[in-house]
Amino acid sequence: MLLPTVPRVRLRSTVRPAIDTPFGPLTFTTAIGSTALPLLPDALFELPGGRTVARWGTPVARVELLLSPYDPGLDPENWGPLTDCRAAVWRIDVLAPIGRVQFGAGLPVRLPEGADAGWDGGQSLAAITVDDDSTRLTVGGNDEEAICHAAGAEVPRRWAELIDEVHDHSHSTWGVDADHRHGMTWTLPPLETGDHCELPVVAAWAPAADETANTWYAALASSTDVLRQVTAEPASAEAVRKC
């Protein structure tokens, strides 16, 4: 469960969870086996600081999605300020064995006129960057190597043994794919009863002309980084836990 000690207020679930970006909403999808979860969650909660947690329940898993402001902690002596930075943490808690799970994060297929999108991944980061004359946006999350290195904390411990498949995909059935350069899809290794998996997604944007505002480095985050920021902030006295 995401952030079990953080107070929350239950909301009506009427809007699909999304991060609003200058190039349209960044939306999220989950498919368990061949079944896609509904766009609207079964439950939605408001947390302090303008955050939300959405929750879906199925017979084989519980899925949660945190949306939150995020401070990437870029050194101001080396990097210029970002316009904004937002993060998501997706979590699945497994109740029965699952052979295939996919999690996706994507911008609209048709971007605004003048916008150009491209793959921008690097070591430990799967990312796309979208820019036009005024704005640069990077959306990033864990690549396969980062997923293996998170084994034991954010993903099942046995996934550390999959590190060789990161460099040889000939027999691999899991990994990260760019969705026509407007998003990414994570296909996970098989999950067993009692497993959990957390994946972060960061969206950071800045003026296109400011090369010191490093949206790429801002996207280098773990789910632990994001969750630690949430729990470090004092909770609102008015927030009521209604789970």
Regions found by a protein language model. Give the residues of each.
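Short, Lys/Arg- and Gly-enriched loop/turn segments at beta-strand edges
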Residues: 205-216
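Glycine/proline-rich low-complexity spacer/linker segments in large multi-domain proteins
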Residues: 216-229
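Intrinsic-disorder/low-complexity, polar/charged segments enriched in Ser/Thr/Lys/Arg/Asp/Glu/Gln
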Residues: 51, 85-89, 181-183, 196-200
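Trp/Gly-enriched beta-strand surface patches
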Residues: 112-193
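Short, solvent-exposed beta-strand/turn "edge" segments of beta-rich domains on protein surfaces
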Residues: 67-85
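Acidic (Asp/Glu-rich), glycine- and aromatic
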Residues: 81-129, 196
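An extended acidic
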Residues: 1-66, 149-158, 226-243
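Short Pro-Gly-centered flexible turn/kink motifs
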Residues: 189-207
